[in-house]
Amino acid sequence: MANLAGELEISPITAKRWLDLLERMYVVFTVWPLSKGLPRAIRKPPKVYFYDTGDILGDEGARAENLVACELKKLAEFREDSEGYNVDLKYIRDKEGREVDFAWIEENKLQELVEVKFSDDSLHKPLIYYAQRLNPNRATQIVFNLKRSFSKARLDVISPIERFGDLLAPGKNK
């Protein structure tokens, strides 16, 4: 929050108030770091994502990550509202600089780690590191410009259509 406040030349308290207002208006949502059980984890700041991915300018990687964040957020809210699950979406960043974009937690258990790349299909080392240490049910690297999906070292490297395609096909799960 202090970095954002510094760039905007406002106080951190004002930045937090603005962010809270934007969240209440459904312009942005925040994803907080996972720190439970991770002694070297960074506990602040949250990542901020736009509900409307058209608001993301420039960096294709940031746009891809924001799009996946929106899809995961929608899926989490659907699971909570329609099926009664307690779902939380977090990210992981530690003091050594390792980061995984998303950690899907359902009923207080880590279910999936998700890393997003625009075109790099080489396995993300922090994803491997945390998949080995935290042992989620699934570890996924979503690559937007992926030529061919593959699995290696208990990690799936897939396209966004493969990850979210069933959600986009009405009637497929009936």
What are these regions (language model features)?
Residues 1-110:
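Accessory nucleic acid-recognition modules appended to NTPase machines
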Residues 31, 92-94, 142-144, 158-160:
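Conserved beta-strand termini and adjacent loop/short-helix elements that scaffold enzyme active sites
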Residues 110-121:
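Active-site ExK catalytic segment of metal-dependent nucleases
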Residues 114, 137-143:
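Short, hydrophobic beta-strand segments that form beta-sheet elements in well-ordered domains
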Residues 119-129:
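Active-site-adjacent loop/helix micro-motif of nuclease/hydrolase catalytic cores
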Residues 131-134:
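Short, conserved loop/helix-junction motifs that constitute active-site signature segments
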Residues 146-174:
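Domain-level recognition of nuclease-like catalytic cores that cleave nucleotide substrates
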